[in-house]
Swiss-Prot record:
Its EC number is 2.5.1.145. The chain crosses the membrane at residues 23-43, 58-78, 93-113, 120-140, 173-193, 200-220, 241-261. This is Phosphatidylglycerol--prolipoprotein diacylglyceryl transferase. InterPro entries: Lgt. It comes from Pseudoalteromonas atlantica (strain T6c / ATCC BAA-1087). Keywords: Cell inner membrane, Cell membrane, Membrane, Transferase, Transmembrane, Transmembrane helix. HAMAP family: Lgt (MF_01147). GO terms for biological process: lipoprotein biosynthetic process. Catalyzes the transfer of the diacylglyceryl group from phosphatidylglycerol to the sulfhydryl group of the N-terminal cysteine of a prolipoprotein, the first step in the formation of mature lipoproteins. One of its GO terms (molecular function) is phosphatidylglycerol-prolipoprotein diacylglyceryl transferase activity. Pathway: Protein modification; lipoprotein biosynthesis (diacylglyceryl transfer). Belongs to the Lgt family. It comes from the Bacteria.
């Protein structure tokens, strides 16, 4: 029966090298995601009063926040013991390892700094960029699949995949589940929802709720990190680290949407050109 499943081919993670520099599939997916997000941001720009300079600054700092926050978050959330024994591991980015939840914290810090610089509200910036985030998430999951990493739990479904280094049994292609839900579906939901003016903070809240829910669901099919495993807890729920980190996002997203709707402060998402508009 095992032979009837798809056996993942051995794919070199490095596409090509020029001297000491190498282009990896995962890095290429980041570039593709950033380019697509930049293009879509230009489309959204036409419906707001942002300037192109402000857009470029925002995306630059947001991208930097993703990279730095993602790496720091991965080390602290998933490899903390290794970091304690080898602090330089934080800088060994060629070994791989990025955390979405860490990247989210990095983006939040970048957006907060940018909103102060642009003299607009933090949630206005968050509402503008939230529909763009799933593009990068989806591209990253494709990179995970090509690298045959972050595979799912063992299964007997007909679309199970035998990944190299994951044993002889077929597994859920959980990377593709996340690509579909956290990338495609979440993008469509946010893009369509944000086409009309919404209460400030509602789009950001919907992103937190949507991603947190999809990630929490997919974690049931994703193999837990070997050095962490599952947290059984008092009720033997067997939840993963990803689910623990996603639960606050779900709660925070619901709370933010309720707050935004109750406040009912309608506005186009974007950076107002005047301080008066920013305070409106």
């Amino acid at each position: 029966m095992v032979s009837s499943y798809f056996t993942f081919p051995q794919i070199d993670p490095i596409i090509f090298s020029i001297g000491p520099l190498s282009l990896r599939w995962y890095g290429l997916m980041y570039l593709v995601g950033f380019a697509a997000a930049f293009w879509l941001a230009g489309v959204r720009l036409s419906r707001t009063n942002w300037t192109k300079e402000q857009l470029s600054d925002l995306l630059f700092w947001g991208f930097l926040g993703v990279i730095l926050g993602g790496r720091i978050g991965y080390v602290l959330f998933y490899q903390f013991e290794l970091f304690l024994s080898d602090p330089l591991y934080l800088f060994k980015i060629w070994t791989g390892g990025m955390s979405f939840h860490g990247g989210l914290l990095g983006v939040i810090a970048a957006l907060w700094w940018f909103s102060r610089k642009a003299k607009c509200t933090f949630l206005q910036v968050g509402d503008f960029i939230a529909p763009l985030v799933p593009i990068g998430l989806g591209a990253g999951r494709i990179g995970n699949f090509i690298n045959a990493e972050l595979w799912g739990r063992t299964t007997d479904v007909s679309w199970g995949v035998i990944f190299p280094g994951a044993g002889p049994l077929p597994r859920h292609p959980s990377q593709l589940y996340e690509f579909a839900l956290e990338g495609v579906v979440l993008f469509l939901i946010l893009w369509l929802y944000s086409r009309k003016p919404r209460p400030i903070g509602a789009v950001s809240g919907l992103f937190l709720l949507g991603y947190g829910s999809f990630r929490f669901f997919v974690e049931f099919f994703r193999e837990p990190d070997q050095h962490i495993g599952l947290y059984e807890g008092a009720f033997s729920l067997g939840i993963s680290q990803g689910q623990i980190l996603s639960a606050p996002m779900i709660i925070g997203g619901i709370a933010l949407m309720v707050w935004a709707v109750r406040r009912n402060k309608m506005a186009e998402t974007g950076v107002p050109k005047s301080s008066k508009a920013a305070k409106a």
